């Protein structure tokens, strides 16, 4: 472009922010079998995952096929899952949003007794032109253990002021 640098106008930035926010709102509103189409909200090589795992390493699913298979597993294991108390926070970057919310639903994970999960979540969404590039999910892993019927160890907090 003749060495000229493209600069977005404030109006362009606001349009992009609204487009990206609508995608985040759609993602958070999906329930039940509708979640089976959630991968379509991502760029082709987009990724999503849980950043609070027992290994200490994120569990990441990359690309539409991997995200589709994850959605199928989630539909089987958490069939009535829903996000609620959703609060979406915009940042200075129109391509990055944070979400704070609660999640709840039956936990039917193979190898564990049927349970019910309620947890508090933080999501980071990085987007590109209305499509998700990366979604990182953070939650309290202790609540996940309880939902799966796994005994939770007690942490001694001697000396902590109350």
Curated annotation (Swiss-Prot):
Sorted alphabetically, the Gene Ontology BP terms of this entry are: phenazine biosynthetic process
- Electron transport as a keyword of this entry, yes or no, is no
Residue ranges of the TM segments? none
Give the induction text.
Under control of LasR. In liquid cultures (aerobic), phz1 operon is induced by quinolone signal via 2-heptyl-3-hydroxy-4-quinolone (PQS). In biofilm (microaerobic), phz1 operon is not induced by PQS, because the biosynthesis of PQS by the monooxygenase PqsH requires molecular oxygen.
Question: What is any Pfam family matched here?
Answer: PHZA_PHZB
Xref: InterPro entries: NTF2-like_dom_sf, PhzA_PhzB
**What Gene3D superfamilies does the annotation carry?**
3.10.450.50
Q: In which pathway does it act?
A: Antibiotic biosynthesis; phenazine biosynthesis
Which controlled-vocabulary keywords does the entry list? Antibiotic biosynthesis
Please give the family membership noted in the entry.
Answer: Belongs to the PhzA/PhzB family.
Describe the task this protein carries out.
Involved in the biosynthesis of the antibiotic phenazine, a nitrogen-containing heterocyclic molecule. PhzA1 (operon phzA1B1C1E1F1G1) has a role in the biosynthesis of the phenazine during planktonic growth.
Name this protein carries in UniProt: Phenazine biosynthesis protein PhzA1
* Organism of derivation: Pseudomonas aeruginosa (strain ATCC 15692 / DSM 22644 / CIP 104116 / JCM 14847 / LMG 12228 / 1C / PRS 101 / PAO1)
């Amino acid at each position: 472009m003749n060495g000229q640098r493209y600069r977005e106008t404030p109006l362009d930035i606001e349009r992009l922010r609204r487009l990206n926010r609508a995608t985040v709102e759609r993602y958070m509103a999906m329930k039940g079998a509708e979640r089976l189409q959630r991968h379509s909200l991502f760029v082709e090589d987009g990724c999503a995952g849980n950043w609070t795992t027992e290994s200490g390493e994120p569990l990441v699913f990359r690309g539409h096929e991997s995200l589709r298979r994850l959605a199928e597993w989630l539909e089987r294991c958490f069939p009535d899952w829903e996000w609620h108390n959703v609060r979406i926070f915009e940042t200075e970057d129109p391509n990055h949003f944070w979400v704070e919310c609660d999640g709840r639903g039956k936990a039917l994970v193979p190898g564990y007794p049927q349970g019910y999960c309620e947890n508090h979540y933080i999501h980071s969404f990085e987007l590109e032109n209305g499509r998700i590039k990366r979604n990182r999910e953070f939650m309290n892993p202790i609540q996940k253990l309880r939902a799966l019927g796994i005994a939770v160890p007690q942490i001694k907090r001697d000396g902590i002021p109350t």
